[in-house]
């Protein structure tokens, strides 16, 4: 039975039914003066009943999918729609709200586009020729804060044509601000031009075409600052990353070969089949020691919406799925096991759902919090779609943070952007300061997490750390921790005083493993690691652009210029990292600001840092050494250190670290 509010001035409501939102088969099924209607001849699949209610030229659309998922999720079904319907709508959104330009970079709009399984003999590819950037390619253009997901069990269940992410800087040649978009669980049949930088995730994909991949912008001068790619199979050709500064690729299969695949400074390939051979820029790593893939939404054989939660795997090589099977994991019923959150839901509603034993699926939107989301039970999951944002609002009611997770087994936090318009201690914290549980059998997973400080707010804010990991056995799979280097507000010294945040990440837990860590522009140590037996596979960093002068930006009692991008405390006895880059861009200073070391670590036999790189992109200042006073300065170009362990460098001075304190935590209700 349908019901709707009164609208239109007079006459009956004319009711038409179609099999999907953009269906070509809408037919009139009734006309009534009432505000309700019972369809006695509905389609058998309850999700294949969309009703258009029309009166006096005004029309509304009702469906169960819209009732469950809200207005920011769009579903496509080739059983009922023309092949070009999805592409045309997505591209119209891309154009209408400026997603190709700087205005789109700061929009509060969020969208997710979900494709139902291919109908036999049909795909979502409207056909086309040429590279994805060409108008003749008929590509889907995916913009800011948008997500594409396949609702099949395996990527080949949903076949798309060409995909393009259009850069908006330097006439389309510069993708260094092409942020905040994602794709998963689909096949791309033609050109896949994923021309992106940070906070962009492409997972669980099948790339069937001969794809130029990252450099398809019609120019030889392209550059980008990506990126992250995982659990994907290239079936036809080895792609090329072109002018990417760096990239992290995990558990991906490429056609045979060992040749270079583009990129400039720091390309890490972990658990991949047929990666490039090792050289200065390329770091192939044989296996992924421990990983759990990100959960995802799909439609099961019974026609119901489910969430697949992949299992933990150790020492993995290649993808987690096959052409016929989803892979190892568990299936959860969305309506029975999950609370589906919609924009406007409050922290009270979200926390009540968690207390009731529900996991939370965040539909795309902007979630304003007056108190943190408190994840306080084993195996709880927070899963965002469409770059859903959980936000500290400027009301100052929430001075604690966006998400606090307790020291519990199996917690998953995925696909969320933490934003701040107010001062706080953290944006996200995992485990209290007294966390000491052993989670080795069922670790905590953080995946596709973005923390953003500044960029849009006009008031002064102060945050101690974007993220603090106190629990042991946490696995992080793709973070961008970002104190904004640009935005809608005035920069320079004003930004240094307005957007204050000391640390991007503080790790106090033991046996923490991080893949694809991006941390930029924080005002002190960008990554501060205090725990033992940690592992870091890939780091990308730029120091703050806007330190006014050297006196305002020095560490270790003023004895050291600036702060290292990655700081292992002197007491740490064991750590292993591979593939770390820090790049100087001191453009907002007095012209005399330098950083002494890209990285700092204790001289200990079991502290091993491999494949470190520093260079200068812009501005007069330099990074003066790679690590611990050795490796050379960016004043004379790119500098690299292949291995540092118990090395020849000078161990940093001992220091006490200013850590956030427990008194700032909220009262647990």
Regions found by a protein language model. Give the residues of each.
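Conserved aromatic anchor
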Residues: 1-10
């Amino acid at each position: 039975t349908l019901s709707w509010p009164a609208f239109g001035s007079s006459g009956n409501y004319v009711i038409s039914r179609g099999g999907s939102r953009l269906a070509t088969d809408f037919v009139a099924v009734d006309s009534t003066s009432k505000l309700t209607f019972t369809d006695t001849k509905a389609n058998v699949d309850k999700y294949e009943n969309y009703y258009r209610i029309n009166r006096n030229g005004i029309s509304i659309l009702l469906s169960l999918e819209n009732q469950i998922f809200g207005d920011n999720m769009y579903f496509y079904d080739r059983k009922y729609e023309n092949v070009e319907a999805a592409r045309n709508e997505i591209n119209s959104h891309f154009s209408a709200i400026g997603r190709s330009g700087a205005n789109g970079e700061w929009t509060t709009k969020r969208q997710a586009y979900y494709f139902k399984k291919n109908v036999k003999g049909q795909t979502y590819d409207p056909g086309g020729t040429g590279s994805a950037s060409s108008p003749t390619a008929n590509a889907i253009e995916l913009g800011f804060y948008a997500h594409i997901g396949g609702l099949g069990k395996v990527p080949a269940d949903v076949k798309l044509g060409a995909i393009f992410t259009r850069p908006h800087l330097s006439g389309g040649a510069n993708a260094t601000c092409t942020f905040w978009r994602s794709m998963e669980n689909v096949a791309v049949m033609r050109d896949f031009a994923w021309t992106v930088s940070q906070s962009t995730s492409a997972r669980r994909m099948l790339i069937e075409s001969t794809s130029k991949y990252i450099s398809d912008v019609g120019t030889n001068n392209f550059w980008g600052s990506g990126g992250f790619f995982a659990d994907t199979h290239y079936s036809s050709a080895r792609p090329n990353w072109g002018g990417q500064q760096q990239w992290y690729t995990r558990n991906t299969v490429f056609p045979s070969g060992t040749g270079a695949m583009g990129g400039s400074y720091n390309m890490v390939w972990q658990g991949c089949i047929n990666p490039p051979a090792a050289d200065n820029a390329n770091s192939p790593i044989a296996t992924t020691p421990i990983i759990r893939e990100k959960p995802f939404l799909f439609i099961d054989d019974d026609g119901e919406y489910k969430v697949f939660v992949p299992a933990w795997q150790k020492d993995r090589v290649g993808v987690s799925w096959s052409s016929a099977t989803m892979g190892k994991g568990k299936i959860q019923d969305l309506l029975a096991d999950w609370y589906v959150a919609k924009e406007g839901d409050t922290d009270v509603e979200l926390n009540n759902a968690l207390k009731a034993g529900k996991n939370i699926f965040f539909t795309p939107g902007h979630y304003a919090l007056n108190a943190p989301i408190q994840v306080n039970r084993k195996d709880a999951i927070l899963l965002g779609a469409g770059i859903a944002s959980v936000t500290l609002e400027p009301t100052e009611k929430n001075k604690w943070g966006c998400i606090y997770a307790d020291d519990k087994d199996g917690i998953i936090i995925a696909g969320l952007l933490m934003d701040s318009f107010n001062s706080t201690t953290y944006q996200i914290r995992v485990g209290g300061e007294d966390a000491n549980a052993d989670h080795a059998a069922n670790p905590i997973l953080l995946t596709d997490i973005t923390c953003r400080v500044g960029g849009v707010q006009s008031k002064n804010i102060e945050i101690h750390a974007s993220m603090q990991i106190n629990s042991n056995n946490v696995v992080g799979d793709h973070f961008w921790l970002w104190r904004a280097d640009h935005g809608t507000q005035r920069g320079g010294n004003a930004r240094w005083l307005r957007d204050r945040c000391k640390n991007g990440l503080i790790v106090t837990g033991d046996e923490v493993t991080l893949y694809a860590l991006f941390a930029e522009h924080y005002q002190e140590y960008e990554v501060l690691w205090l725990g033992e037996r940690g592992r870091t596979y890939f780091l990308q960093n730029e120091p703050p652009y806007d330190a006014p002068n050297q006196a305002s930006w020095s560490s270790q009692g003023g004895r050291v210029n600036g702060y290292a991008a990655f700081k292992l405390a002197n007491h740490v006895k064991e750590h292993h990292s591979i593939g770390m880059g820090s790049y100087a861009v001191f453009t907002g200073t007095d012209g005399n600001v330098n950083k002494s070391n890209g990285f700092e670590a204790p001289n200990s036999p079991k502290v091993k840092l491999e494949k470190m790189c520093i260079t200068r992109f812009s501005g007069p200042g330099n990074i003066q050494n790679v690590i611990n006073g050795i490796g050379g300065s960016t004043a004379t170009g790119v500098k690299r250190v292949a291995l540092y362990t118990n090395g020849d460098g000078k161990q940093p001075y001992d220091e006490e670290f200013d850590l956030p304190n427990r008194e700032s935590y909220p009262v647990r209700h």
